[in-house]
């Protein structure tokens, strides 16, 4: 009872005393709350500068045509800079109100010339290969499939941030191109922490991006910048964009035409007629799995979300592995691969790793093999690439036990591995439009060839027309005189020499010259 009376008396004194500051009684704003408030002011100012929230939310459809350059960072024919420069042309029409998308994209670089049209209507969609004249259904089609492309308009980025306002935080000030920026962050629904840089003078969005672990450059940022804003109705919209990745520019484009709320006719969202109809790929890629394709020869399929495969051979006292794929956003693919390999061939050390070429998605997973004490066998171009990648300082990538890599390169464009039961031959079939030096792995007894990027068969059983790298690959196979019955690939399913020839015949009969 005495305790209760004491508490009541204390409350009365607090309320009555004129000498106790009100701030003691009021809840103090916490650091996260203050950070949110400052970030929210920056975002609100940016939305106002771009036309105001009402005008931004009134965007129901847009038509964007852009033209520019693409830079093949760590995907060029050689490992050294400058990177190969290609071209891109794209028309993107999006009607979010009606769930409609038309994307017409042409790109050309490193021997590949692609022309793809995509049409989405609600939950149905098709991809049209304009050179091969094939039509493929899109599983789980939605306007959100093009969310990344839709963000080419800054108002979309700002509205997404507003819709996640409780996650806004103030990060500080920065400078881009000599101009002061106010920098805030927001957490997207996919848990990606996005950073927005707002011009301190104009309040226009300069840049947005996020940090990630790059298998080549280490700690990096994927970012998109906007410039040359212009007025379109009530809106402020950019004249172009620059996309950054792996420590540098990978695309520069000019917005040659941009229209808002024209309500395109339904007839716009119709693909070409008369194309060969193919079956849809699986809606969800199957998990990585090992298949025995010959005695002591295995293919591990389904890495990188179903896009990459690995070959491995169990010799008498060791294992030879071909390829160490890794995503641009480092995802421990070699950890998965090693676990599968060791479960399939327990007790044998992984002595050799053959890397076909220096591109990041094929060689970026080398670190885990270095930790195993594996000797890497590859080309001089890839050796240079690996040494630079190993030297990259990173707090996000796995630490290398030693930056002294054990790398052996081919002599006279050939290397042979063998014991009394197994024979594996490695050939450099470069120069190729895709890579100056590029290896294929041949198993003479099994009549199996394993290659990367030179012949890509889609899972649904079809072949696109041959691109320049495929034509060069076919010519080199004829010169080598290898007796091949099955062609396995880093990308896609196994193929036959007959399918390779058919792919080349399609190219000769196509409009792509």
Can you describe what each PLM-predicted range is?
Residues 28, 33-41, 48, 119-194, ...:
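Flexible, processing/modification-adjacent segments and terminal tails
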Residues 291-341, 438-457:
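Conserved beta-strand hairpin/beta-sheet module of binuclear metal-dependent hydrolase folds
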Residues 474-513:
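Divalent-metal (often Zn2+) His-rich catalytic cores of metallo-beta-lactamase-fold enzymes
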Residues 26, 177-273, 439-444, 451-452, ...:
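Gly/Pro-enriched, hydrophobic low-complexity segments
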Residues 34, 41-134, 167-172, 328:
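N-terminal mature ectodomain segment of secretory-pathway/periplasmic proteins
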Residues 331-377, 479-485:
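Active-site metal-binding motif and surrounding structural segment of the metallo-beta-lactamase
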Residues 14-24:
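C-terminal segment of classical bacterial N-terminal signal peptides
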Residues 252-315:
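Zn-dependent metallo-beta-lactamase
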């Amino acid at each position: 009872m005495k305790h209760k009376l004491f508490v009541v008396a204390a409350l009365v004194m607090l309320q009555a005393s004129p000498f106790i500051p009100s701030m003691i009684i009021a809840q103090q704003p916490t650091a996260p709350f203050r950070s949110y408030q400052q970030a929210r002011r920056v975002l609100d100012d940016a939305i106002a500068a771009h036309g105001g929230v009402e005008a931004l939310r009134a965007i129901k459809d847009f038509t964007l045509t852009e033209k520019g350059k693409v830079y093949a960072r760590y995907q060029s024919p050689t490992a050294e800079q400058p990177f190969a420069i290609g071209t891109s042309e794209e028309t993107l029409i999006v009607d979010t109100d009606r769930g409609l998308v038309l994307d017409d994209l042409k790109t050309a670089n490193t021997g590949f010339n692609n022309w793809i049209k995509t049409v989405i209507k609600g939950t149905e969609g098709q991809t049209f290969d304009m050179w091969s004249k094939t039509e493929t259904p899109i599983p789980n089609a939605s306007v959100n499939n093009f969310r990344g492309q839709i963000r080419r308009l800054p108002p979309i980025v700002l509205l997404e941030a507003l819709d996640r306002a409780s996650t806004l935080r103030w990060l500080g000030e920065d400078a881009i191109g000599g101009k002061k920026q106010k920098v805030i962050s927001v957490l997207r629904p996919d848990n990606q922490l996005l950073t927005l840089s707002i011009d301190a003078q104009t309040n226009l969005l300069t840049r947005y991006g996020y940090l990630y672990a790059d298998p080549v450059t280490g700690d990096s940022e994927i970012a998109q910048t906007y410039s040359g804003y212009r007025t379109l109705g009530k809106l402020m919209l950019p004249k172009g964009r620059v996309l950054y990745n792996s420590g540098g520019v990978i695309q520069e484009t000019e917005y040659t035409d941009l229209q808002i709320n024209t309500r395109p006719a339904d007839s716009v969202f119709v693909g070409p007629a008369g194309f060969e109809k193919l079956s849809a790929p699986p809606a969800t890629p199957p998990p990585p799995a090992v298949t025995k394709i010959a005695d002591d020869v295995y293919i591990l399929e389904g890495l990188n979300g179903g896009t990459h495969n690995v070959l491995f051979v169990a010799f008498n006292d060791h294992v030879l592995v071909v390829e160490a794929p890794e995503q641009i956003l480092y995802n421990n693919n070699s950890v998965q691969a090693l676990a599968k390999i060791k479960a399939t061939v327990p007790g044998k050390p992984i002595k050799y790793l053959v890397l076909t070429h220096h591109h990041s998605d094929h060689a970026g997973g080398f670190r885990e093999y270095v930790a195993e004490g594996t000797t890497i066998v590859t080309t001089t171009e890839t050796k240079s690439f690996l040494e630079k990648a190993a030297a990259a300082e990173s707090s996000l990538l796995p630490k290398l036990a030693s930056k002294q890599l054990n790398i052996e390169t081919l002599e006279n464009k050939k290397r042979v591995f063998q014991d009394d039961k197994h024979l594996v031959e490695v050939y450099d079939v470069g120069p190729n439009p895709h890579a100056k030096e590029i290896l294929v792995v041949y198993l003479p007894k099994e009549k199996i060839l394993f290659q990367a990027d030179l012949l890509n068969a889609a899972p649904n059983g079809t072949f696109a027309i041959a691109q320049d790298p495929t034509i060069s690959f076919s010519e080199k196979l004829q010169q080598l005189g290898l007796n091949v019955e099955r062609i396995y690939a880093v990308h896609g399913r196994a193929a036959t020499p007959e399918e390779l020839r058919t792919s080349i015949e399609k190219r000769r009969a196509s409009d792509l010259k």
